[in-house]
């Protein structure tokens, strides 16, 4: 009798061959998977370059700095031309207060003392009109400008050092360092009034410009703090009071010296190197 192709013996042979093939593929694939596993893990691990952070210290004590600051100037506005301006015109106390900017470059003399050269600038512009006079039904208007630019030499003393040396080559900045300072000023100013005015003799109205400008010797004292931001950059906050006075020019005859005193409150940044 012919052999049937579907007999149990042949089926067992085919099944055994299939099982053997599956086992063989499993053995071959397993080493490849095992070998590829660590490679994936290694790819996800950070490299030394990714872990690098720039050190927050300097490799030497910084001896030079440049700085810029801005803030508010409250001028004293006492006496003389300021009193007359407030008496005749619609100008109030505090109208000559203004923003102020200052640039500095300095050099460390020692761990506790700096010497710097500074230039500041401020300008107030105040529109006004006469309090007691009209031109018909119209106000008599004018403008007063008061500009100042002190050029200063300043010595700054740190109450605690701005940083410390670690070993021979690393300088670590202090988080916060307070200081006091003082210096002398060559104080430039310009006081200008332009527009329409009333002649006190015959009460006639005329247009003109009156100006006084020049230099005055002065001085200042200050106190502040320096806070480390990043590496070579520091934030500074300072309060400063300055003194100065000088005679007015010939456009303003019979007045006492113009008062240049004022309080500055500023914030800024300094870059050390």
PLM regions: where:
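N-terminal secretory signal peptides that target proteins for export/translocation
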Residues: 1-13
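Outer-membrane beta-barrel transmembrane domain signature
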Residues: 107, 157-165, 169-259, 263, ...
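Short glycine/proline- and aromatic-enriched beta-strand/turn motifs that initiate or cap beta-hairpins
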Residues: 33-107, 191, 270-272
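Generic early N-terminus positional signal peaking at residue ~5-7
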Residues: 5-7, 26, 39
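Extracellular/periplasm-exposed beta-strand and loop segments of Gram-negative cell-envelope proteins
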Residues: 75-96, 121-151, 187-216, 244-262
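Bacterial N-terminal signal peptides
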Residues: 14-28
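Gram-negative (and chloroplast) outer-membrane scaffold detector with strong preference
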Residues: 51-55, 61, 107-198, 265-273
